[in-house]
Structure formats: structure tokens, C-alpha cells
């Protein structure tokens, strides 16, 4: 489904939070949304890959990577795993790599930067915990909606039909 965050903010101004504008769309799908699964990790993609291997229909993986711009948490292999398992998208408060390949994969990927260096794969991190970045706190099972204009957060799904 396509989302227009500007229109959603107009319709649901009193019930959404707006994430500070620091994210860039790197994926093949610029607009995406759904219920979030949260991850908190730092320069380690192991827990991310494990989460993406689970069914993600209607979900968005939201990663608090500490804002690191030294190592990429998401690459084309991770995006392909997300697509294969039905995830709507990935929002990463951290970096990605292989940006030309990411553009070819039909999954949403928003991140703050790109860098060619990959993160470790030790599996260190937490899943389904509250995370805070971009001026908002994200709780597991909240809902996010993203497009090239921005990212918004709602505690409940928005009636956009």
C-alpha cells in the first residue's frame, strides 16, 4: 500500500508523532508502513538477520543502531531476506551499504547514511524493546508510516482505506 505522510499528518494530526527529518530512502519501495518490531543493537547485524528470517507480513523492522555511521547494519542480502519473508520495510537509525542494489529490491529501507563497511554478525542486541531516536519513543507493536517526505508513528493502525 502507498502512504502519503503529509496527508496522514493532516488527517491524524492529534494522534501521530513525527520523527525528526534525518532519514533517506534507500530501498526499492519509498512508501511503506505497518506494525513495528524493534531492535536495539550497535554495529552488529546478527540479531537483525535473525529477525528478518521470521514472517513479517504487514510489519516494519525498526532498528536503533545508535546512529552509527561507521558500519552498515543493512545490505542487499538483508533487504532480500526481508522481501522474501513479507516485511514491508526497514527503518534503521544507522547505516546501510550496497545502495545501488538496495534500490532494486522492492522493500522499503530508510536509514541515516550509507557506508561500504559491514557490521559484525555476532548476534548482540535486544528485540522488542522500547527505543528512542528522532525525537520519539517507539514501542513494540506501534505503527509507522514512511515515504520520501518523512516517517510518522502511531500507537494504533491508522484507518487509511
From Swiss-Prot:
Protein function: Globally modulates RNA abundance by binding to RNase E (Rne) and regulating its endonucleolytic activity. Can modulate Rne action in a substrate-dependent manner by altering the composition of the degradosome. Modulates RNA-binding and helicase activities of the degradosome.
Gene source species: Pseudoalteromonas atlantica (strain T6c / ATCC BAA-1087)
Family indicated by similarity: Belongs to the RraA family.
Name the record gives this protein: Regulator of ribonuclease activity A
Highest taxon, organism lineage: Bacteria
UniProt keyword terms in alphabetical order: Cytoplasm
Cellular-component GO terms for this entry: cytoplasm
Summary of subunit composition and partner proteins: Homotrimer. Binds to both RNA-binding sites in the C-terminal region of Rne and to RhlB.
GO molecular function annotations of the record: endoribonuclease inhibitor activity; enzyme binding
NCBIfam families assigned to the protein according to its UniProt record, in alphabetical order: NOT-MenG (TIGR01935), PRK09372.1 (NF006875), RraA_entero (TIGR02998)
Biological process according to GO: regulation of RNA metabolic process
InterPro entries: RraA (IPR010203), RraA/RraA-like (IPR005493), RraA/RraA-like_sf (IPR036704), RraA_gpbac (IPR014339)
Amino acid at each position: 500500500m502507498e502512504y502519503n505522510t503529509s496527508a496522514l499528518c493532516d488527517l491524524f494530526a492529534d494522534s501521530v508523532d513525527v520523527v525528526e527529518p534525518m532519514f533517506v530512502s534507500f530501498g526499492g519501495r519509498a512508501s511503506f508502513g505497518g506494525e513495528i518490531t524493534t531492535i536495539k543493537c550497535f554495529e552488529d547485524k546478527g540479531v537483525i538477520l535473525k529477525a528478518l528470517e521470521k514472517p513479517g507480513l504487514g510489519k516494519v523492522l525498526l532498528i536503533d543502531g545508535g546512529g552509527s555511521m561507521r558500519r552498515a547494519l543493512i545490505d542487499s542480502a538483508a533487504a532480500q531476506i526481508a522481501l522474501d519473508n513479507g516485511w514491508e520495510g526497514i527503518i534503521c537509525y544507522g547505516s546501510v551499504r550496497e545502495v545501488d542494489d538496495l534500490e532494486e529490491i522492492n522493500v522499503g529501507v530508510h536509514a541515516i547514511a550509507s557506508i561500504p563497511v559491514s557490521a559484525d554478525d555476532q548476534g548482540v542486541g535486544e528485540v522488542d524493546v522500547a527505543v528512542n531516536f528522532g525525537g520519539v519513543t517507539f514501542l513494540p507493536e506501534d505503527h509507522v508510516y514512511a515515504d520520501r517526505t518523512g516517517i510518522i508513528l502511531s500507537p494504533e493502525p491508522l484507518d487509511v482505506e
